């Protein structure tokens, strides 16, 4: 759940203008409309807009939003989405700045790092198409981040004011595309989750280095490995949809065929997950932990 997009945009902008379409604390469901063409399908549930900014700097314009989904006042899913319009404005300088923000940031970026599980990138000239999948120590990243610029005071204030709880461990994905051959727009998107929404097992190790989800450790924890494999498949499929949404040029697309399952596999995996959840509910009902009414309501929620 690293807020890398907010950090990247701080690299460019200092003058804030009126926020765009969505307002802080607005609740959104089903779709998030960044513009007429970019309409992001949201995972099920009610999403709260936490950050909403429109910024301008010497002819460069950007939109940035962060959204969260809560369960019992705990963040279980997080999305950041941003668009920057750069066409015709100081192109050489902007190209270099974007390159440095994505590939030369010493804290996070589109390059191999020990804590990153998967990095897929196309890079040629000023063009890049990037997917990063990783895990994180959420509370450390939030309260004591390695990058001193990672402040996001508005988000911290919102969490504090609303007494929101954070997960200890998060799985995340980062998606970015920029090309002068594609209208000079830079799109950035990131997702973060509490692994429990994928029925992930308990975590005994929290730090990035010791986490069961670290690529050097995960083979020792088959249940965590299964959860990460689900997340990799979901993230790869989301990147494919991201490429379609913003009309990425064909030769710039990433080859994610080995990461993204077919629709039939996704359907089978989903069916297996539903069966597992219903079996767990049935055990709770048999053991007297749930009443019949509670069991039926919970089962209906899963099936819907």
Where does each model-flagged region fall?
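Sec/Tat signal peptide C-region and signal peptidase I cleavage site
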Residues: 15-19
């Amino acid at each position: 759940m690293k807020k890398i997009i907010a950090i990247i945009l701080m690299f460019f902008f200092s003058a804030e203008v009126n926020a765009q379409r969505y307002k802080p604390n607005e609740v959104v469901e089903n779709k998030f409309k960044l513009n007429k063409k970019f309409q992001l399908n949201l995972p099920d549930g009610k999403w709260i807009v936490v950050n909403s900014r429109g910024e301008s700097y010497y002819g460069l314009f950007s939109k940035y939003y962060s959204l969260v989904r809560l369960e019992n006042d705990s963040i279980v899913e997080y999305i950041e989405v941003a668009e920057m319009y750069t066409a015709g404005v100081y192109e050489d300088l902007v190209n270099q700045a974007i390159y440095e923000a994505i590939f030369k940031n010493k804290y996070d970026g589109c390059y191999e790092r020990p804590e990153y599980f998967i990095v897929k990138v196309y890079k040629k000239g000023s063009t890049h198409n990037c997917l990063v999948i990783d895990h994180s120590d959420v509370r450390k990243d939030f309260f004591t981040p390695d990058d001193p610029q990672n402040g996001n005071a508005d988000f911290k204030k919102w969490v504090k004011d609303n007494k929101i709880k954070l997960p200890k461990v998060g799985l995340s994905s980062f998606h970015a595309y920029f090309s002068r051959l594609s209208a000079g727009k830079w799109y950035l998107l990131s997702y973060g989750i509490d692994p429990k929404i994928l029925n992930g097992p308990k975590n005994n190790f929290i730090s990035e280095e010791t986490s069961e989800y670290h690529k050097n450790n995960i083979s020792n924890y088959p249940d965590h490995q299964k959860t990460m494999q689900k997340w990799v498949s979901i993230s790869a499929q989301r990147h494919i949809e991201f490429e379609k949404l913003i009309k990425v040029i064909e030769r710039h697309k990433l080859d994610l065929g080995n990461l993204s399952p077919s629709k039939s596999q996704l359907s089978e995996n989903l069916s297996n997950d539903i069966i597992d959840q219903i079996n767990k509910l049935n055990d709770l009902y048999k053991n007297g932990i749930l009443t019949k009414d509670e069991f039926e309501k919970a089962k209906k929620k899963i099936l819907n």
